[in-house]
Amino acid sequence: MSLYNNIFDAHAHYDDKWFDDDRFELLENIHTKGVCGIVNNAVDLEMPLIVHDREAHGDVYDLLRKYKPNALVHCFSGSVELMREAVRMGMYISLGGVVTFKNARHSLEVASEIPLDRLLLETDAPYMAPVPFRGKRCDSSMIIYAAEKIASLRNISISELLQITCDNAKQFYNIDD
């Protein structure tokens, strides 16, 4: 890999010199550099960054620690400890229909403990429809189910939770009234 580490070459006659592991490493390197570029651009342009870190918490958080963007972790799937780290870095956490699932222990713990000024709601449409719509196509009208569950966990009214998360969204996206 060292001969070709700094280039992406499409010459087919080199094909016999590459092994599957080398190709995987090259593609992973290209992907990582692309993601770094996106994160860096968000920081340089002072734009909000929406991050989906599914099955890549360690790598993603390494990048976020390095670049320190204004970030929202979309469809958060991590532990309470990971949520706390994200909050310490000033990030927002977005939760959706998963909090209505019976087996969503991590999401319920996060929903119970996240500082309310760091919480956003989402649907992740067309996926992750909340109970009672599991297995169906999710849409934005279903966000209320996540809001009801989180409000119940936090012992606050749904309208209060919706106001808080609306204010948080305005803050994150830099929207003036």
Regions found by a protein language model. Name each.
Residues M1-D177:
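Mid-domain alpha/beta scaffold segments of enzyme catalytic cores
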